[in-house]
């Protein structure tokens, strides 16, 4: 990992120290490997910081008519709140008007999941995702709606399990009504 390359304490040692600080007995059998598992899990949740974006495969339109919007609704993704490093469960809906060719459906979903795999502030993430999709999908227009359930306010702070945050962004001339549903685990 990056921390090890800089000669800093190994991440597992930092997690172990944090657990001890919280009062946990790090020698207990159920906890002894927790630092290693935690670092691995955090690596998975932030893979978008280290991995390149997925390549997008395009298919020819094969018709002369002007293409209308393509809508993909309720893509499930997980991110982290950049302020607390707690999970944000996301449901993302996107619409785009194809430019030169149509991207493969699975690639659009993979791109959204890759983009979410990092610490985010949802408002900024939604704007960035719209820009990213415009570029990577070679779209003429894009609309994005993100519905997020933030664990930082679900399990701590105000402890409200009924709220969700919805953010929207548009690029170009696209007339669609997106409606994300609350992420599946939170319904």
From Swiss-Prot:
GO cellular component: cytoplasm
Any single biological process term in GO: tetrahydrobiopterin biosynthetic process
Enzyme type, top EC level: hydrolase
Keyword Zinc assigned: yes
PROSITE patterns, A to Z: GTP_CYCLOHYDROL_1_1
Listed SUPFAM superfamilies: Tetrahydrobiopterin biosynthesis enzymes-like
Domain of life: Archaea
Family matches, as InterPro entries: GTP-CH-I_C/QueF, GTP-CH-I_N, GTP_CycHdrlase_I, GTP_CycHdrlase_I_dom
Keywords, ordered alphabetically: GTP-binding, Hydrolase, Metal-binding, Nucleotide-binding, One-carbon metabolism, Zinc
Pathway linked to the protein: Cofactor biosynthesis; 7,8-dihydroneopterin triphosphate biosynthesis; 7,8-dihydroneopterin triphosphate from GTP: step 1/1
Complexes and interactors: Homomer.
Name the UniProt record assigns to this protein: GTP cyclohydrolase 1
Organism: Pyrobaculum neutrophilum (strain DSM 2338 / JCM 9278 / NBRC 100436 / V24Sta) (Thermoproteus neutrophilus)
Gene: folE
């Amino acid at each position: 990992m990056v921390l090890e390359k800089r000669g800093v304490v190994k991440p597992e040692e930092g997690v172990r120290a944090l657990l001890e600080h919280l009062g946990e007995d790090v020698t207990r059998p159920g906890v002894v490997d927790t630092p290693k598992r935690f670092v691995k899990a955090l690596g998975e949740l932030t893979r978008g910081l280290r991995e390149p974006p997925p390549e997008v495969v395009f298919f020819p339109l094969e018709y002369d008519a002007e293409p209308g919007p393509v809508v993909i609704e309720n893509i499930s993704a997980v991110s982290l709140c950049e302020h607390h490093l707690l999970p944000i469960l996301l449901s993302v809906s996107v619409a785009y008007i194809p430019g030169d060719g149509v991207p493969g459906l699975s690639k659009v979903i993979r791109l959204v999941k890759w983009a979410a795999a990092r610490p985010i502030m949802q408002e900024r993430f939604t704007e960035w995702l719209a820009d990213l999709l415009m570029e990577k999908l070679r779209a003429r227009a894009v609309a994005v709606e993100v519905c997020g359930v933030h664990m930082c306010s679900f399990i701590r702070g105000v402890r409200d399990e009924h709220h969700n945050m919805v953010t929207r962004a548009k690029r170009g001339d696209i007339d669609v009504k997106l409606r994300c549903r609350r992420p599946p685990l939170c319904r």
